[in-house]
A protein has these predicted regions:
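C-terminal and inter-domain tail/linker signature
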Residues: 2, 9-142
Length: 142
C-alpha cells in the first residue's frame, strides 16, 4: 500500500471542455437570474428538476421563479459580483459579493451548483454571511 498518489487528470479539475461549459453556463445563469432578475432568460440553464437546499427558497423550477420575483420586487438594486469561480466535474462553486440589498450591508456568498449531463443546473446549495467592517486577521473576505 502506498500513500503516494500519482497525479491524474482528476487532480487538475476544471480543465476539461465539459467543465468549462458547466462553469460558463452557471455564470451566465447567475448573471441573468440574480443580476438581471430575468427568469425567462435564466430558465434555459435549469434542468427539469431543480433541487434547492437553501432553507429560504422553495424547491423546483417554479420555486426558483418565485425567488426571482421576490428579488426583483424587494431588492431591485441588488447586484451579485462573482469574485471567483471554480469547477470540479459536475459541480461549480462561486464566491460572490452581494450589494444593494440593505444600505451599508455587503454579503459574502458561496454558491454551489450541480449540473447534469446536458450542462443544465439541477441542484443548488449556498452559505451566506454579512461582511464585517473589521476582521480579527485584518484580511478582507474577497
Amino acid at each position: 500500500f502506498s500513500l503516494f498518489c500519482p497525479l491524474t487528470p482528476a487532480v487538475f479539475a476544471g480543465n476539461s471542455d465539459n467543465e468549462q461549459l458547466n462553469k460558463k453556463n452557471v455564470i451566465d445563469f447567475y448573471n441573468k437570474s440574480l443580476n438581471d432578475k430575468d427568469f425567462a432568460a435564466a430558465r434555459p440553464y435549469l434542468g427539469d428538476r431543480y433541487v434547492q437546499h437553501n432553507p429560504m427558497a422553495k424547491d423546483g423550477v417554479a420555486g426558483f421563479e418565485q425567488f426571482i420575483v421576490f428579488l426583483k420586487n424587494k431588492y431591485p438594486d441588488s447586484h451579485s459580483e462573482i469574485k471567483q469561480a471554480f469547477v470540479d466535474g459536475d459541480h461549480v462553486i462561486l464566491h460572490v459579493e452581494v450589494t444593494g440589498r440593505e444600505p451599508g450591508v455587503t454579503r459574502a456568498i458561496i454558491d454551489i451548483f450541480r449540473v447534469d449531463e446536458q450542462h443544465k443546473i439541477v441542484e443548488h446549495w449556498d452559505v451566506t454571511q454579512n461582511v464585517p467592517q473589521k476582521t480579527a486577521s485584518g484580511n478582507g473576505m474577497f
